[in-house]
Amino acid sequence: MASPSNHSASSLTAEPSGALLGSITVPGDKSISHRALIFGALAVGETRIGGLLEGEDVLATAETMRRLGAEVERHADGTWSVHGVGVGGLKEPDQPLDFGNSGTGARLVMGLVAGHPITATFIGDASLSRRPMGRVIAPLTETGATFHAREGGRLPLTLTGAGRALPITYRLPVASAQVKSAVLLAGLNAPGVTTVIEETPTRDHTERMLRAFGAHIEVEDGPRGLIVIRLTGEPELKPCRISVPGDPSSAAFPVVAALLTPGSEITVTGITLNPHRAGLYTTLMEMGGDIEVMNQREEGGEPVADLRVRASRLKGIEVPPARAASMIDEYPVLAIAAAFAEGETRMLGIHELRVKESDRIAATASGLRANGVKVHESDDGMVVEGRSGEVGGGGHVATHIDHRIAMSFLVMGLAAQKPVTVDDAAMIATSFPNFTGLMRGLGASFVGRAQ
């Protein structure tokens, strides 16, 4: 659905730009930032965090950890410290926990609170309050927690944790790192072993970080391709020093912009290429994208690398549905790349996008059509008809309060024949506070009040 043509106070227009050139560092990984604060709050002692993403979502989690009893402080050098209260030591908050737009923060903290004998009310913005929480509520109820929520398990909801949390064995009905992590967080304060069984691998930042903080966690290959994760409850978590690598989901926007804008060559330094997060980059290379992986290393248990990206002629492909979990947040910007490719790009098995910050399939398809690109939408995916580098642009796109929709179509505007306007760019601050400044530094042109 296109927005009205008059610009709102937070609208932003991306104009066709010259070559994007330079080296950038994107903000710290959002998934790892949330978890660093949460596990720091559960450790005994001081955890130091460098590179924390200071977007609105992560800052909401930091404030939540304070309300649950941890001391969380930002220092002048940009590092953060968390003085934890230990597993089982959370205090009951004296006011609602406000997660803003952050589904990750809300779901992880539900798991955390479910394992403690306290009551907390969870609230969020209009977008988060539309998102279903039932898939988290179901397993946490098995641990002994109780919930009072709006219809469909939506926020605001009140959660009372178990007086004595039960260790459970839970098989994930759909691939979801958030549900997996919520169950493991609840299991931390349960006696015995909590087991999670996955049919499809999902991002494993929680498992990696639990190990780093000293928890006993085992990950094994089970029968018929299943993955079995076992966590021994009631550990004493030890504080850590964590360096948060760059977020591959944020890096996706400058990377795709450089691929699509003629003459571009950029380097993105220090992003995590965790195999459960790198699906977009694999896909772009299969499409013919000139992406060189350099300086591979490991930092804080996470694989990290630099990327050199050069403008490329892309071709359409069929994205394997099994890859969806490793790139679920990147489909909107992949659809932009597909619009400039030669031939069709088929993206199926992504029904999960219907219940993100917006219905991302519908929002992406609508934005593509508004800019002259043909797209065929189905219940669980879309097929984009590429225009071989000749995307008309000129459209006004409704973002539906979704940061990834906003950034994706701003990327389109840099490479299209005419400018592209998004109706609301304010929410970009939830995940990528310096998006416009960083992109301008590479040569991108943006016009509008939302900066």
Swiss-Prot record:
It is an enzyme of class 2 (transferase). It is found in: Cytoplasm. Its main location: cytoplasm. The active site is at D329 (proton acceptor). It catalyses: 3-phosphoshikimate + phosphoenolpyruvate = 5-O-(1-carboxyvinyl)-3-phosphoshikimate + phosphate. Pathway: Metabolic intermediate biosynthesis; chorismate biosynthesis; chorismate from D-erythrose 4-phosphate and phosphoenolpyruvate: step 6/7. Keywords: Amino-acid biosynthesis, Aromatic amino acid biosynthesis, Cytoplasm, Transferase. PROSITE patterns: EPSP_SYNTHASE_1, EPSP_SYNTHASE_2. The keyword Ribonucleoprotein does not apply. 3-phosphoshikimate binds at K30, S31, R35, S176, Q178, D329, K356. One of its GO terms (biological process) is chorismate biosynthetic process. Phosphoenolpyruvate binds at K30, G103, R131, Q178, R360, R404. Its EC number is 2.5.1.19. GO terms for cellular component: cytoplasm. One of its GO terms (molecular function) is 3-phosphoshikimate 1-carboxyvinyltransferase activity. Catalyzes the transfer of the enolpyruvyl moiety of phosphoenolpyruvate (PEP) to the 5-hydroxyl of shikimate-3-phosphate (S3P) to produce enolpyruvyl shikimate-3-phosphate and inorganic phosphate. Belongs to the EPSP synthase family. Monomer. This is 3-phosphoshikimate 1-carboxyvinyltransferase. The gene is aroA.
